[in-house]
């Protein structure tokens, strides 16, 4: 038996007007609101205005921390207000949302998400990333998908532009990773549906990405910003839920194996998830020998200011042996779809992508 649930979503600058009705669908009268400090400052006024005059009680507003670690997850789990709430409203980027989603597993709570940045698809997914206290990857948790997503393009447009930029970088991976992971064929219905939807993920980025980034840099809520936010949160989020099931995993591949391995390499500087993943996409195309898409995506990375070389993410070719070693521990490497990954091919792909990037 397989049951597939997908998040409802409301998009628009007036999206919070739908919040009381969405809560009523679940009989919810008590909520706790958890998120990043900046995210709460952006989202709370709209949430509170929408709930004013209703029978919904806000039991707590909590800053979750700064990363989705076990310690921060435990703080949510141990909060009396979160234990009492009918619904947890998670506000912020991927790390804030993943913290709340993971805590909700133990608390057995419904989660609504408010992505105040669109740096990844966490607002829609039934998967969450958990990090160690030192920032290295611990692994994944598998919560229920959020029940409802509230996407406010104005909040996203007024957030720091680097998160929008990195979100485009992360979303660039969805279509090629799923296409490669499923390329052996013989897909059952749900995975096939995920692949069909994956085919819709890249073109909106090429169409609206440059304009959207320009608009976000001017704090301008525009059609381009909305289209990119929908693509990152909804398109790629739905694909994630359809391509990640108990009996198969096609949700990520070489690009995320590369990113996850980099998390264990000590180096100066900080690099956003999607920033590094976008370079991993070039590694993926080098790995598969897809020169046409390597050139296309690399040109787009260059146009967007996303990385095209190892040096741009604080790495060098001397790190490649360690990247191969750390990649072995990643879920992507263990799944090995459509066929087992090899150190030799992975190392050669990193070198080839880096060499091509240096020509741009």
Each predicted region: which residue ranges?
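ATP/NTP phosphate-donor binding region
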Residues: 1-84, 310
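Generic secondary-structure signature for well-ordered alpha-helical cores
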Residues: 24, 52, 56, 135, ...
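A short, small-residue-rich loop immediately preceding and capping a beta-strand
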Residues: 80-103, 107-116
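Active-site segments that bind and position negatively charged phosphate/pyrophosphate groups
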Residues: 188-299
């Amino acid at each position: 038996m397989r049951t597939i649930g997908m998040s409802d979503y409301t998009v628009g600058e007036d999206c919070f007007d739908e919040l009381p009705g969405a809560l009523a669908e679940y009989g919810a009268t008590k909520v706790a609101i958890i998120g990043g400090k900046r995210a709460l400052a952006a989202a709370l006024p709209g949430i509170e205005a929408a709930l004013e005059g209703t029978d919904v009680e806000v039991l707590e507003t909590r800053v979750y921390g700064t990363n989705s670690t076990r310690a921060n997850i435990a703080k949510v789990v141990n909060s009396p207000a979160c234990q009492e709430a009918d619904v947890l409203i998670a506000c912020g980027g991927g790390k804030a949302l993943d913290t709340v989603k993971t805590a909700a597993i133990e608390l057995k709570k419904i989660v609504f998400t408010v992505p105040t940045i669109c740096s990844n698809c966490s607002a829609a997914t039934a998967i969450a990333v958990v990090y160690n206290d030192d920032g290295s990857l611990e692994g994944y948790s598998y919560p229920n998908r959020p029940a409802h997503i509230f996407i406010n393009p104005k909040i996203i447009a007024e957030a720091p532009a680097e998160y929008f930029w990195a979100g485009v970088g992360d979303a660039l991976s969805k279509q090629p990773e799923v296409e490669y992971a499923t390329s052996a064929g013989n897909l059952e219905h749900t995975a096939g549906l995920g692949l069909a939807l994956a085919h819709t993920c890249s073109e909106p980025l090429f169409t609206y990405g440059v304009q959207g980034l320009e608009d976000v840099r001017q704090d301008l809520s525009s059609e381009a910003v909305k289209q990119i936010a929908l693509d990152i949160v909804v398109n790629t989020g739905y694909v994630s839920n359809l391509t990640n099931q108990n009996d198969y995993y096609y949700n990520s591949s070489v690009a995320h194996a590369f990113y996850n391995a980099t998390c264990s390499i000590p180096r100066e500087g900080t690099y956003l998830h999607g920033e590094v993943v976008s370079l991993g996409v070039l590694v993926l195309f080098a790995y598969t020998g897809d020169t046409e898409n390597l050139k296309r995506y690399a040109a787009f990375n260059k146009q967007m200011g996303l990385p095209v070389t190892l040096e741009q993410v604080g790495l060098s070719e001397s790190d490649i042996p360690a990247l191969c070693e750390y990649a072995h521990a990643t879920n992507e490497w263990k799944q090995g779809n459509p066929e087992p990954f090899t150190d030799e091919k992975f190392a050669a792909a990193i070198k080839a992508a880096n060499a091509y990037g240096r020509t741009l």
